[in-house]
Amino acid sequence: MGVKKKKEMQVAALTICHQDLETLKSFADVEGKNLASLLLHCVQLTDGVSQIHYIKQIVPLLEKADKNGMCDPTIQSCLDILAGIYLSLSLKNPLKKVLASSLNSLPDFFLPEAMHRFTSRLQEELNTTDLYSYRKVTDNISSCMENFNLGRASVNNLLKNVLHFLQKSLIEILEENRKCAGNHIIQTQLMNDLLVGIRVSMMLVQKVQDFQGNLWKTSDSPIWQNMCGLLSIFTKVLSDDDLLQTVQSTSGLAIILFIKTMFHPSEKIPHLISSVLLRSVDCTSVPEWFMSSCRSLCCGDISQSAVLFLCQGTLAMLDWQNGSMGRSGEALLLDTAHVLFTLSSQIKEPTLEMFLSRILASWTNSAIQVLESSSPSLTDSLNGNSSIVGRLLEYVYTHWEHPLDALRHQTKIMFKNLLQMHRLTVEGADFVPDPFFVELTESLLRLEWHIKGKYTCLGCLVECIGVEHILAIDKTIPSQILEVMGDQSLVPYASDLLETMFRNHKSHLKSQTAESSWIDQWHETWVSPLLFILCEGNLDQKSYVIDYYLPKLLSYSPESLQYMVKILQTSIDAKTGQEQSFPSLGSCNSRGALGALMACLRIARAHGHLQSATDTWENLVSDARIKQGLIHQHCQVRIDTLGLLCESNRSTEIVSMEEMQWIQFFITYNLNSQSPGVRQQICSLLKKLFCRIQESSQVLYKLEQSKSKREPENELTKQHPSVSLQQYKNFMSSICNSLFEALFPGSSYSTRFSALTILGSIAEVFHVPEGRIYTVYQLSHDIDVGRFQTLMECFTSTFEDVKILAFDLLMKLSKTAVHFQDSGKLQGLFQAALELSTSTKPYDCVTASYLLNFLIWQDALPSSLSAYLTQQVACDNGDRPAAVVERNTLMVIKCLMENLEEEVSQAENSLLQAAAAFPMYGRVHCITGALQKLSLNSLQLVSEWRPVVEKLLLMSYRLSTVVSPVIQSSSPEGLIPMDTDSESASRLQMILNEIQPRDTNDYFNQAKILKEHDSFDMKDLNASVVNIDTSTEIKGKEVKTCDVTAQMVLVCCWRSMKEVALLLGMLCQLLPMQPVPESSDGLLTVEQVKEIGDYFKQHLLQSRHRGAFELAYTGFVKLTEVLNRCPNVSLQKLPEQWLWSVLEEIKCSDPSSKLCATRRSAGIPFYIQALLASEPKKGRMDLLKITMKELISLAGPTDDIQSTVPQVHALNILRALFRDTRLGENIIPYVADGAKAAILGFTSPVWAVRNSSTLLFSALITRIFGVKRAKDEHSKTNRMTGREFFSRFPELYPFLLKQLETVANTVDSDMGEPNRHPSMFLLLLVLERLYASPMDGTSSALSMGPFVPFIMRCGHSPVYHSREMAARALVPFVMIDHIPNTIRTLLSTLPSCTDQCFRQNHIHGTLLQVFHLLQAYSDSKHGTNSDFQHELTDITVCTKAKLWLAKRQNPCLVTRAVYIDILFLLTCCLNRSAKDNQPVLESLGFWEEVRGIISGSELITGFPWAFKVPGLPQYLQSLTRLAIAAVWAAAAKSGERETNVPISFSQLLESAFPEVRSLTLEALLEKFLAAASGLGEKGVPPLLCNMGEKFLLLAMKENHPECFCKILKILHCMDPGEWLPQTEHCVHLTPKEFLIWTMDIASNERSEIQSVALRLASKVISHHMQTCVENRELIAAELKQWVQLVILSCEDHLPTESRLAVVEVLTSTTPLFLTNPHPILELQDTLALWKCVLTLLQSEEQAVRDAATETVTTAMSQENTCQSTEFAFCQVDASIALALALAVLCDLLQQWDQLAPGLPILLGWLLGESDDLVACVESMHQVEEDYLFEKAEVNFWAETLIFVKYLCKHLFCLLSKSGWRPPSPEMLCHLQRMVSEQCHLLSQFFRELPPAAEFVKTVEFTRLRIQEERTLACLRLLAFLEGKEGEDTLVLSVWDSYAESRQLTLPRTEAAC
C-alpha cells in the first residue's frame, strides 16, 4: 500500500498545419461524431496525454464504417492528415507509438487508401533538401520499420527513393562535418545524424523483404547502385579517424552486413572477409563492384581501428549458429582470433582497448555457437590446451586488473566462455577431473587474494565444475575470503564469489543428501566464519561483511537466522555470566556477539526475514539488549541497533511505542558522534523511520476515516488508529524538543550537525503538501521565537556545514522572520551582517553572507534599501516570491557594491589600512553568495542588472589591480608593504614597484648576486613603519589601532583574489549571455567574457601565491566549461586559441621569461589543466593529443641551456595532467613517454629539472599503480604483475631494460669517482612494484627474466639506499620456487676469507639480496612443508661456508650486521619449521658456530675503537638479536638453565651501548608482558625469575631515556611483592622512599617516562594499601601527593599518552579508591579522582574518552555499585558514560553517608567555581585581536552544559531520593554568595554587549550564556535545598529559552538575588 505520488508522464502535444486544420473544420459534422470531428477535437487540445485518449478512438470509429467509407473524401482527407501527423511527431513522443499501434488495427478495406496517403506523405519527406531536416526524415524511416505495418509497406514502396535519400544525406552530412571542423557542438550533432543514418541503412537491409531475393542484384538496378554507393560511404567512414569511434564501429558492422547481403555466392563470403582482415585480397578475383566500393579495404593500408571494427562486424553480422558457413566459416573464426591477438599487442588507446575486449568476448560467444553445432574439426583448435585458448587466457590474466571496470567485466565473460568452450570439446567425458580444470584451479588458488581477477575467475570455475572440488583442495577458503573483506576495493569481488560458492555448495549438498543433516555442514562452512568476523574482525571488515555479504547469505538462506541468533545469544549469555565458553565470539576489545546479533537482526528485518517487529522484540532479543546496543562503545553496534529499529521492508509498518521510546533514548546520547560516516548513517536511518511514520500514518488516517465503527482487526495495528496517530504526534514533538535542546550554547559541531540534519529531514518528510494528504506532524507548529532565534544563531558556527543546514531549515519553515522579529531587530541584523562582511576574521564574512541571504529570502530587509531601486518589480501573484527575492538581492548587491567601491578607493591609497581595517574580500564573498541563490536565467529587472554586472566586473578588476602586486611578488608570504600618512600614494607605488617579480628564472644561468643598490637601510625601513592612527576615518567609522602583520596583508590580498576569481567564474557559469549587443535577455556580452578570460590568463600565468592561482583556476574552469558549450563559434574556439598561445610562450621561454619556473611553474599547469579538462570527453580529444605531444617533446633531455626553462615547465605541466582524474584513461597512452622523460630528466645536471622530474615520476607511479591503499610501502595492493605492466606500456620494456643495463654495466666501474647513477633510483622504484605471477606462463616476449642479472648488479652500487632498493626489487622478479637456487647462487659469489681483493659494497648488496629473498621465502611457505625444511637446511650449509663475514676477519661492520641478520633469520625459520624438532640446528652445528661468533665478538671482548665507526649501531642491534636467540635456545635445550651460553642477559644489560641494552630489555619486556596477560604458556621463564634486584639496580643508574622507560615497564609488569622488599637492600631506599622517587620521576620527566612512572607508582601505592592495612596512615602524605599527581596528569595540554596512563591507573585502582564501600582517601581526594574521570570522559581525544569509559564500566560493575545503573558489565559509549559515572558517584555519596560534605563540592563543579568571569572576558578580547585565524574554543566533543545537565539531574534525584536537607543555612552560604555575585556580573556583561551580539561578539556571548546556564542550574538547586522550589520547577531543562533564562539572572529580578 503506497502513498507516493506517481510521476506524471510528460507528452508533447501534436499540432497540424493551418491548411489541415481548415480541412478538418470543413469536414467536421455538427454532432461531432465523425472522424474529422474526432481529429479536430484532438488537435485543439494542448495536453498530449489527453490526445492519446482521442487517438485510441480512431480505429473503433472507422470499424463502424462500411466498405463504402473508403470512397468518403472525409475519411481520405483524415487518413492523409493522420499520415502527416505521424511523420511530424518526434521519434520519442509516446503519441507516435500510440498512433502506429492504432493504425496497425485499421480495417483491411481502408489499408490501400491509407498506404497511398502514407506513401505520398513519406515521398514528400524524402524530397527535403534541408540538411538539418535530414535527421527527422531518417528518424521517420526508422520508426516506420518498427512495428508499424503501414510504415513498413510505405518504405517498401519507396525503397529506391529511401536508399537514394540515405545515400544523399550521408554524403552531405560528411561534407558539412568537414566544413564545420572546430565547431564541436555542430560536429557532435552531425556525427550523431551520421550514426543514425548508418543504423537506419542497416535496418532497411535486415527488415525489408525485397532484400531477401536476388531481383535487385543487377548492376543496372537503382537499388543495387544505391547499395554500392552506401557501401562506398561506409568504407570511407570506417577509414576516417576524424569521426567518432562509435560511428566508425557502426560502419564496420554495416560493411559486413552489406557484403553478406550483396555478395554471391554466399559460400565465398567467409573467404572474402578473411582475406580483407588478413590484408591479402586478390584484387583480380573479387567482383568489380566490390573493388569500386571497398578499394581502400582491398588495396590500401587499413588502420588498426578499421580492422578491429571489421572484426566486430564479422562476429556480429554473420550467422555462426548451426555451422551454416561450413569449413570456410570455421577458418574465418580462427583467422579473426589471430587478427584480434595481433591487434591486442598493438592497440593502446583506451577506447579501442575497450572495443577490443568486447570483440574478443564476442568472439568466444561465436566460438561456442560453432562448437555447439558439433564441429569436430574445431575441437583441437579450441580446447583448453590449444594455442588460441592459451592466448585468450593470457589476455584475461593481463587485463583482469585493468582500471576500467567494463574491460574487467569483459575478461570475466571471456573466462566463463573459455570454460564452456573446453567443456564442449570434452563433452561426454567426465570433465571435472580434466587436467585443464585441475591445473587452472590450482594455479588460481596459488595466487594472492589481492588480485581482483582471482575472484571472478574462481566464481566462473565454481559455476562450471562445482565448489566441492575447490573446497577439497582447501576448506579454509571461505575464511580466507572473509579475511580480505577489510579492503574496500576487494569487497564487491569477495562477496560475489562467496555468494556463488555458498549457493553452489547448498545445491550440491541438497542433491547429495536426502536428510536435513546437510544444513549443519553448510552452516559450519559458511556461517561460522561469518560469525567469527562479525565478533572479532576489525571495524572495516565487519562493516563491509554486514553491507555486502550478510544480506546475500540471509536472502538465500533465511532459515540460517535462527541458527545465528542461537549461537550469538549463547555467547552473550556466557560472557555476561563471566563464563568464557565461547571465547571466539567476542572479547572485551571487540564489538563481540552483541554487535553481531544486532547486525544479523537488522539485515533480517530490513530484507523481510522477520515477520514483524513484535516477533523480533519478544522472541529474538530482549529490551535490555536493545538498550545496550543503542549506547554500545563501538559505533557500528549502535548503528546496527538503530538500523534494526528504523529499517523495515514494509514502508507502512507501524512504529511501535517501544521503538519510539528506544529512538528517543538513542537520540539523547548519540548526536555528538565524532565520525562523519556514523553521523551520516544516523541521520539516514532516522529519515527512514520518519518516512515510515509518515506513510503508516496515511494508512492509519484512512482506517480512522473509514465508516466502520467497529474496532479494526488489522495486522497493522493492535490499537485504535487515533491512539497511534496521537502517539506519533507526541513522539515527533518530543524528538524535535530534544533536537532543539541539543542546539544549546557551546554545543559541539557534531551535535549541531546531527540535530540540524535530523530537523531538516523532519521538515522534508513532514512537509505541508498542496492539497489533501494528511500530515501527522508539522515542524512549524513547534517553532516559537526562541527556537527561531536558536536556528539563526547557528549562522555563527565556524563550520559552514552548520550554517548551510540552519539556512536550509529556516527556508523550509512556513513561519518567517517577520513573524518573530520587529523591524528594529531586523535592522540590527542587517547592520551586523554589514559589519561582519568587512571583518578581518575570514570566517566572519561567511556568516555575513548567510545572514544577508536569510534577510533577502525572508523579505526582512530594512526599508531604507529601497532607495537603491530605480524600477519596481511587476509581477502577478504566482511569481511574487521570486520577484521579491530578485528585488531584495539587487538592493543588497548595490549596497555592498557601494561600500566596496569606497573601500577599494581607500585601499588604492593605503593597502595596509585596508588589510587591518576593511579587507575587501568579505564584501565580494557576500555578493557571490547572494547571486548564487538567485535564478539568474529568469530575471525580470534585466535593465537594472546590466549596469550592475558591468560595474561589478570593473570593480573586480580594480580590486584585483590593488592586491595583485603582492600576489605576484617574488615572496608573497613574507611581504609587508609599508606606507606613511603623508606620502601614502607615492610611497606605496614605490614599494609595489620594488616587489614586482624578481625570480626571473636567471638562477638557471648563474647564482644571483645582490648588487650594492639592492641593499637597504634597516633604519629607513623602520622609519617607514607607522601604526594606523586611531583617528583615521573610513566611511565614518573609527578604525582601532592594530599592528599590521605580513600575514594580514597576505590574507587580505590572496582572499580578495580568490573571491574575485570565484565571482567571475560564477558570473560566467550562471549569467545568460548576450550573443549580440542588441539582445534583450542576456546580461553578459561576448566582449566581457573575453575580458574575463584574459583576466584569468594573466593571473594564472603570473601569480606566485598558491592560494591565489588555485582559486583563479576554479573560476577559470567554470569559464572554460561555459565556452565549450557555447554556440558562439568565436567563444567556443577561445580555449583552443589560449592553449596554442601559452604553449608557444612556454616553448619560447628562457631565463628572462615572465613565466614563473619556480613554485612548480605556479599557475601555468592549472591554466593548461583547465583548458584540457573542459574538452568534451566524447570527442576525439584532439587538444589533449596535440598538447601531450608538444609537452613530451619539450620534457625530453636537451643540451641547449635555452631549453631548460621550457623543459621544467613541460615536466611540471605533465605532472599536473597525469594527476588530473578528469582526464581519466585518455591520459594513459602518454604514461610511457612521461615515464621516459622523468627517468631521463633525473640525470640532468640542472637541479630544477631533476626536481620536476622527481615530482612527475611520483605522479606517474600513482597514476600507474593507484593511490596508496596499504600502510606497508611494499604491499602488493599497489603493485602489478610484470605481464600486466609491460602489456599496458610495452614501450617501457626495452627502455627500462636498456637503462638498467647501462646503469648495471657501469655501477662498479674502477674509474675514479664512483658513478652514483641518479636514474637507478627511479628504475628500481618502478621495478620493485612489479612481481612475477604464476599465471604469466612461459611467454618470453615480455619476460621479467632479463631484468634479474641487472638488478643483481645494481646491488653493487656505491649508494647504500640503492643497494637496499635493488634487494627489494629483486624479490618479486624471482618465483618462490626458484628462490633457494638464487640464494645459493648469490652466496657462491661472496668472497672467501683467503681472497685478497674484494669490495664491501658488492658484499653488502649481495647479502641484502640474500636476506630479502630468504625473508620472502619464509613468509610464503608453511613451516610444515618438508621441501621447505630441506631447502632451508641446504641454505644453512651454504651460509656456513661464508661464516667469516660475520666474524672479526671481516673489518666492515655493515656487512657483518647483514650477515648476522641472515643467521638470525635462519634461526627463526628453522625454529618455526622444526617446532619441537630442535636438533635440526644442532645437527648442522649451527648453534655452535653462532656461539663462536658471539664469543669472538666485541660484546665479549669490548670495542677497541671510538663510537663513530660506520654501521656500529646496526651491527650492535644485529649481534644482540642473535645473542638473545642463542640464550633462549640454550635455555630451552638445558631446561631453562643458563648454561653453555657465550653471554648472559646480565652481561647484555650491563653493556655500555644503549642499543644493546634497549634490545635486551625489549626482549625481556615481551616475556614479562606475555606472562602478565596470561598468554605465556608457563608464566615468566625460570631464567628471568629473581631478576627484580637486577632491574632495581639498573633503574637507579640508567641514563638513557628509552632504556629507563623499558626498565620501569618491566618493574610494572612484575609483582611488587617480589622486588619491593629488596629496595632497601639493593638501592638503599625504603619502599616508601622508592615510591617518592617514582612519583618525582612521574612529576618531572618527559611524557613517556612520566606515564610509565605514574603506572608504577600507582601499582606500588595499591600494593601498600592492600598489604599494609594497619599502617596506611604512614604513607598518608604520599597518598595525597599521588592524588595530586593524578590530577595534574589529566590536564588537556598534556600528551595523549599521559592521560591514557591516568585512565589506566584510575581503572586499576577503582575498586580501591573510587568505589570502595569504606573509603580509604579523604572525601575531597576521592571526589578529586572522580573529577579526573569526568574530565577524561570529556576529553577531545577519542582514545582517552574510550579508555575512560572502561573506568566507568569497572566502577559500575562492583558489588556495591552494580545496582546503581542498568548497564553494569556493559561496554558503553563515552556520551552515556558521563551520565552513568555521575549516577554511580551520587549513589556512592549516599552509601558513604557523605552528602553534607560532598554536596558543596558537587555544586562547585556545577557552578564552575574556578572560573574568574572578569579575567575570562578580558582574555577573550585579547584573543580576538591577536590571532587572525583563531576560531575561539572550537569544541569537537566536550560540551560544558551537557555535564551541567547530567550533574543537575543526578543531584536532584539524589536529593529527592534521600530527602536530605542542609542542617543549617550557613552551610551553603558561601555558594549562595558566589552565585549572587555571578548573577550581577553576568547582568553587567550582558548590558555591555552591542546589539546582535550573538553575531558580532559570538565568542563572548557564548561564554556568557554558558556561565549563565550554570548559574541558573545552581540557583535552582539551591532554591530546592531551601525549600523554595518544588520538584516540578527543578526538572525543567537547564536551558530554557534565552529570554526566560535572562530574566532569572538580571539584577531587577528577585530570583536572581
From Swiss-Prot:
Modification type Phosphoserine: residues: 1015, 1024, 1161
Family membership: Belongs to the THADA family.
Listed A to Z, the keywords are:
Chromosomal rearrangement, Coiled coil, Phosphoprotein, tRNA processing
Which regions form coiled coils? 886-918
Q: What tissues harbor this protein?
A: Expressed in pancreas, adrenal medulla, thyroid, adrenal cortex, testis, thymus, small intestine and stomach.
What molecular functions are annotated in GO for this chain?
enzyme regulator activity
Which GO terms of type biological process are on file? adaptive thermogenesis; lipid homeostasis; negative regulation of endoplasmic reticulum calcium ion concentration; tRNA methylation; tRNA nucleoside ribose methylation
Q: Which disease is it linked to?
A: Chromosomal aberrations involving THADA have been observed in benign thyroid adenomas. Translocation t(2;3)(p21;p25) and translocation t(2;7)(p21;p15); the sequences derived from chromosomes 3p25 and 7p15 do not appear to include a coding region and the fusion events probably result in truncated THADA proteins.
Among InterPro entries, the record links this protein to: ARM-type_fold, THADA-like_TPR, THADA-like_TPR_C, THADA/TRM732_DUF2428, tRNA_methyltransferase_THADA
Would I find tRNA processing among this entry's keywords? Answer: yes
Q: Which gene encodes it?
A: THADA
Protein name as catalogued:
tRNA (32-2'-O)-methyltransferase regulator THADA
Which is an annotated Pfam family here? Answer: TPR_Trm732
Briefly, what is this protein's role? Together with methyltransferase FTSJ1, methylates the 2'-O-ribose of nucleotides at position 32 of the anticodon loop of substrate tRNAs.
Gene Ontology CC annotation, any one: cytoplasmic side of endoplasmic reticulum membrane
